[in-house]
């Protein structure tokens, strides 16, 4: 679902834009809101999964991802859709590393583990292509809402199977989380990208362009320091 959702809405973007009145400049936030939240919180999500419990965070990630998908699928405004996509990214940042960690601890034999990671890699690699095809089919024969709602039954099935078949595990040691750092990096990326998008309408010398790009660079510099 994590990889699938990075591409499944691409074909549906024109329909979303017309239905929700999204401007050309803001249309990319359907994609960007998801990828920024996912990428910005991925390391933090992996650390939380390792120490809070991989199975628990995997299930929480699935439920949260399903809820965000449901919220986005029912969106009637662009703001709701953007927020839902960002929320999907947040829970994807928990779900993806938890899934990888579970594979690592479940398959202790090196050969079996290699096979499991091979299957995971194949599914992840094909997920983007499948997302484009599935997004086109759902948009053509249903509507764009289903490009998000399709995640709900998938997540429900995954939760039902995970509860009895996946065993809990967690790492030991230092459990400190760099939450301020993750938030700073994510906000910096969002501000920087937003400033770049404003350049299309206001120009590179526009007040908002300079303000948001400057704020983004400052936040990223703080994160690196």
How would you name each of these model-derived features?
Residues 1-164:
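Transmembrane-helix bundle of Major Facilitator Superfamily
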Residues 118, 140-225:
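Hydrophobic transmembrane-helix bundles of small-molecule transporters
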């Amino acid at each position: 679902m994590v990889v699938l959702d990075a591409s499944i809405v691409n074909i549906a973007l024109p329909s979303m834009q017309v239905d929700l009145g999204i401007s050309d400049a803001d249309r990319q936030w359907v994609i960007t809101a998801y990828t920024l939240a996912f990428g910005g919180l991925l390391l933090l999500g992996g650390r939380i999964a390792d120490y809070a419990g991989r199975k628990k965070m995997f299930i929480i990630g699935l439920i949260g991802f399903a809820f965000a998908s449901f919220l986005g699928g029912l969106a009637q405004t662009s703001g709701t859709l953007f927020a839902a996509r960002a929320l999907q990214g947040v829970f994807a940042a928990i779900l993806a590393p938890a899934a990888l960690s579970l594979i690592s601890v479940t398959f202790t034999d090196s050969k079996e583990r290699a096979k499991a990671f091979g299957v995971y890699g194949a599914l992840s690699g094909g997920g983007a292509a499948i997302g484009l095809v599935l997004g086109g089919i759902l948009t053509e024969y249903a509507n764009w809402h289903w490009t998000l709602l399709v995640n709900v039954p998938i997540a429900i099935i995954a939760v039902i199977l995970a509860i009895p078949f996946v065993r809990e595990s967690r790492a030991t040691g230092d459990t400190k989380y760099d939450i301020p750092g993750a938030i700073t990096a994510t906000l910096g990326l969002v501000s920087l990208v937003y400033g770049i998008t404003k350049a299309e309408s206001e120009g590179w010398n526009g007040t908002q362009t300079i303000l948001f790009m400057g704020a983004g660079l400052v936040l990223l510099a703080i994160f690196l320091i």
